[in-house]
Amino acid sequence: MSTEGPSLASSPAISPLAFLSAPVTPGTLAEATDPLPMLIALACIFLLLATCLLFMTLCKPAALDPSRRRAHECMPHHPGSPSEPQLRLWKRLGSLRLSLHSFRHGRPTVPRQPLPGPEDNRSHCDYMESTKM
C-alpha cells in the first residue's frame, strides 16, 4: 500500500497548448490539408474589404473628402450639390409610396355632412326654394 497520491507518470498533465506539439496522425493530416475552410475564410475577408472599398468610393464620407474641411450643412440647398439627385430620388420614392397607399385604400371619400338638426331647418328650406322654379 502506497500512501502517496497518483503518480504524474501514469496520468500526464494536459497543457492548454498541447495540441500544438501533438504528434500528427494520418487522420488529422487529411483534415489539415483540406483547403475549403481556408478558401472560405479568404473569400469572406476579400468580400469584406471589397465592400469597404466600394462604400468609400461611392459614398465618399466627409472625413475622407479633402474638399470638405469646413463645417457644412447636412442638407445643402444650393442646386449644384451632388446630393440633389439623391434628394430627388427620395421625393420620387415618397410620391410612389403615397400613390401606392392611396391605390390600396381607394380614393379618399368626402367627409359626410351631419344630418341637419332643427335649427338648420330654415337653411334647408331656403336651399330647396332656390332650386325650385
Curated annotation (Swiss-Prot):
Q: Keywords for this entry?
A: Membrane, Transmembrane, Transmembrane helix
Asked whether the keyword DNA damage is assigned, the reply is: no
Predominant place of localization = membrane
Q: Where is this region: Disordered?
A: 105-133
Membrane topology, as annotated, equals:
Single-pass membrane protein
Where does it live in the cell? Membrane
Family annotation (Pfam families): DUF5527
Chain segments annotated as transmembrane: 36-56
Any one annotated GO CC term: membrane
- Compositional bias, Basic and acidic residues, is annotated for 119-133
Checking InterPro entries in the record gives: DUF5527
What is the name attached to this protein's record? Uncharacterized protein C10orf105
Species of provenance: Homo sapiens (Human)
Q: What is the lineage of its organism?
A: Eukaryota, Metazoa, Chordata, Craniata, Vertebrata
